[in-house]
Amino acid sequence: MSLLNCENSCGSSQSESDCCVAMASSCSAATKDDSVGGTASTGNLSSSFMEEIQGYDVEFDPPLESKYECPICLMALREAVQTPCGHRFCKACIIKSIRDAGHKCPVDNEILLENQLFPDNFAKREILSLMVKCPNEGCLHKMELRHLEDHQAHCEFALVDCPQCQRPFQKFHINIHILKDCPRRQVSCDNCAALVAFEDKEIHDQNCPLANVICEYCNTILIREQMPNHYDLDCPTAPIPCTFSTFGCHEKMQRNHLARHLQENTQSHMRMLAQAVHSLSLIPDSGYVSEVRNFQETIHQLEGRLVRQDHQIRELTAKMETQSTYVSELKRTIRTLEDKVAEIEAQQCNGIYIWKIGNFGMHLKCQEEEKPVVIHSPGFYTGKPGYKLCMRLHLQLPTAQRCANYISLFVHTMQGEYDSHLPWPFQGTIRLTILDQSEAPVRQNHEEIMDAKPDLLAFQRPTIPRNPKGFGYVTFMHLEALRQRTFIKDDTLLVRCEVSTRFDMGSLRREGFQPRSTDSGV
């Protein structure tokens, strides 16, 4: 407010200058501690800043007062600064002057250093509040200087470069120019429908393969790509050499006159032909005969080799088909053995199965990308005899309601070898655990225990290889909790399932199983 009062109280340019000097002295004292920061900031100005347009080169309405003009560039002050001697300059102008002309004020030659300059925010506000005219030709808008840049960004009279010919046009006219006037606008060829630039269309028309052209000899109208064949084969008036030109006839005539020429010059043509044959007969032929004989022998050898190779290819094809059939049988046998081994391994679990889920980082990435992740474990038995079960792990998507970013874990019954001898529905206790793989003495596994509910479809005897109904936890564990400890090691997650079955002994006896005696002597 002191600066505002100082400006308003000065009635002349001299008093204004005196006021500014006083203000500069007070500001210099008040900002003494900040002069180092100001010096560093001023000293680090880039060369690109120094080369920018200094003052505001715009038309003011009313005209700009002289007190807002930079004495160096004679334009409106941009980023106005004051000197201790009370003069105002554009920041870029005065810094350039100090660096080029020496440390002195351009107006009164007083000693002036860069760190003595200070921003004139009052003048800056005043100048930005002045009314200016839009510099674009044809635009009548007036606005405060502070709004000029925003106006020019949307002004319909601003110049923009045509994206096709790169010439500048006013924004409101650019669309019409692009569609109707631009020499590089795309137009379609009337003959081949190809898109070409308007200024290149004349050249294209002169070379278009589908353009209609007139034969220069017979005036027939054809498309350009047909013309060479027309000249060589069909044109009746095209000049062609005599058929006997190879034998010495140098006459040329129109194609429709060739028959008459051959008829009228039969004797001379025969003499030329006889002379050519006679000259050939004088050439020794022993070399040619031997060469032809060599070619014949080579051809005979190649034909024999071709026949042998054809037989070999047929034999190899038959062997390959036999081997392919054998390999297919071996693959089926391997799959059968693998299934049997997996079944035997599943029977050895005795109700405790540890499921190793590899490449778990890939599954987490799919979950983050909102791709469904559902994984089933191999089957395992609760004992021998026992029920066959498997686990299902589901990574809930971030957008799922009430269970977003949770691990869901379920148990499914499967068709097993002993199903006909076991009591149904399944009864027992299931303990699901995600194992802590840290090296700590006491590991903090994440565990849940559930009891089977015989009335649910999930525990009835399955009628297909895997019961579609499962039993477990939709919100077994949050993914954030999974990352807090070492549940994932070597990109592998370990899930443990421990099953304790409760058999109805009467049912077991009816199914043909007898309970093992506790007597150690048996």
UniProtKB/Swiss-Prot annotation:
The pathway noted for it is: Protein modification; protein ubiquitination
PTM text: Sumoylated on Lys-124, Lys-142 and Lys-453 with SUMO1.
Q: Which GO cellular component terms are attached?
A: CD40 receptor complex; cell cortex; cytoplasmic side of plasma membrane; cytosol; glutamatergic synapse; lipid droplet; nucleus; perinuclear region of cytoplasm
Q: State where the TRAF-type zinc fingers lie.
A: 150-202, 203-259
Q: What is the protein name given in its UniProt record?
A: TNF receptor-associated factor 6
- Glycyl lysine isopeptide (Lys-Gly) (interchain with G-Cter in ubiquitin) crosslink: positions? K124, K319
Q: Where in the cell is it found?
A: Cytoplasm; Cytoplasm, Cell cortex; Nucleus; Lipid droplet
Q: What is its EC number?
A: 2.3.2.27
What does the UniProt keyword field contain? Coiled coil, Cytoplasm, DNA damage, Immunity, Isopeptide bond, Lipid droplet, Metal-binding, Nucleus, Osteopetrosis, Repeat, Transferase, Ubl conjugation, Ubl conjugation pathway, Zinc, Zinc-finger
Q: What is known of its domains?
A: The coiled coil domain mediates homo- and hetero-oligomerization.
Zn finger limits (RING-type): 70-109
Query: What function is annotated for this protein?
Result: E3 ubiquitin ligase that, together with UBE2N and UBE2V1, mediates the synthesis of 'Lys-63'-linked-polyubiquitin chains conjugated to proteins, such as ECSIT, IKBKG, IRAK1, AKT1 and AKT2. Also mediates ubiquitination of free/unanchored polyubiquitin chain that leads to MAP3K7 activation. Leads to the activation of NF-kappa-B and JUN. Seems to also play a role in dendritic cells (DCs) maturation and/or activation. Represses c-Myb-mediated transactivation, in B-lymphocytes.
Q: Which organism is it from?
A: Cercocebus atys
Q: Where is this region: Interaction with TAX1BP1?
A: 1-354
GO MF term set: histone deacetylase binding; identical protein binding; protein kinase B binding; protein-macromolecule adaptor activity; tumor necrosis factor receptor binding; ubiquitin conjugating enzyme binding; ubiquitin-protein transferase activity; ubiquitin-ubiquitin ligase activity
- Give positions of region: Interaction with TANK: 355-522
